[in-house]
Curated annotation (Swiss-Prot):
Any Pfam family hit: Rieske
PANTHER family in the cross-refs: 3-PHENYLPROPIONATE_CINNAMIC ACID DIOXYGENASE FERREDOXIN SUBUNIT, FERREDOXIN-RELATED
Subunit structure: This dioxygenase system consists of four proteins: the two subunits of the hydroxylase component (BphA1 and BphA2), a ferredoxin (BphA3) and a ferredoxin reductase (BphA4).
Residues covered by the Rieske domain: 4-100
Gene Ontology biological-process annotations: catabolic process
SUPFAM superfamilies associated with the record: ISP domain (SSF50022)
Keyword rRNA-binding listed: no
Organism: Pseudomonas sp. (strain KKS102)
Protein name: Biphenyl dioxygenase ferredoxin subunit
InterPro entries hit by this protein: Rieske_2Fe-2S, Rieske_2Fe-2S_sf
Residues reported in the UniProt entry to bind [2Fe-2S] cluster: 43, 45, 63, 66
Keywords: 2Fe-2S, Aromatic hydrocarbons catabolism, Electron transport, Iron, Iron-sulfur, Metal-binding, Transport
Length: 109
């Protein structure tokens, strides 16, 4: 696995999200009570940013475009209209750095 620094833990307060870009990928970094998760940033139902236009409640992000919900831990759809899960990325914390393996996105259907 190749982990790359995506941001600092200080850039993503608890209950918030941050969009980061790597190559052509836009990825959302979520802070769920000090635990960090990385998913694709775009809702699978419409072209909408989950980090900039979503609402995080616990480990579930709601897309504000059509109110679909996803688990940020697994990418699984929690509430339609989306039917496709989000890609999730391996993530780890080293010191104050949030590291993501952008090459290993996975779907957990």
């Amino acid at each position: 696995m190749t982990f790359t620094k995506a941001c600092s833990v200080d850039e993503v307060p608890p209950g918030e999200a941050l969009q980061v870009s790597h190559d052509a990928q836009k990825v959302a970094i979520f802070n769920v009570d000090g635990e960090f998760f990385a998913t694709q940033d775009q809702c699978t139902h419409g072209e909408w940013s989950l980090s900039e236009g979503g609402y995080l409640d616990g480990d579930v992000v709601e897309c504000s475009l059509h109110m679909g919900k996803f688990c940020v831990r697994t990418g699984k759809v929690k509430s339609p209209p989306p039917c496709e899960p989000l890609k999730v990325y391996p993530i780890r914390i080293e010191g104050r750095d949030v590291l993501v393996d952008f090459s290993r996105a996975a779907l957990h259907a």
